[in-house]
Amino acid sequence: MKLDILAIGVHPDDVELGCGGLLLVEKSNQKKVGIVDLTHGELGTRGTAKTRNEEAAEAAKILALDTRENLGFADGFFKNDEEHQRNVISIIRKYQPEIVICNA
């Protein structure tokens, strides 16, 4: 599936907090939109990984996302190395987005 916009966040809820409004507007403009979370947010202080994944699924419904995936990287422990880069590259190739949004 080709996406117009792919937003990548480190933790579930990063994308929603950073650009959820933009994604909602673009969905109303008939754009195909997806989110990829790199981790399950297991080190976060705002709930367990299970809770955050449940909330991410609910947010996907509210935002009417075309897809949402989680790459399952270890929160706080993944590196900017070839292995992790290849995972992200494969997602970008899979969805061939026109626009990629990511947080720093």
Predicted features and spans:
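Active-site rim/loop-helix segments in enzyme catalytic domains that contact anionic ligands
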Residues: 1-95
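Acidic beta-strand-to-loop metal/phosphate-binding motif
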Residues: 98-104
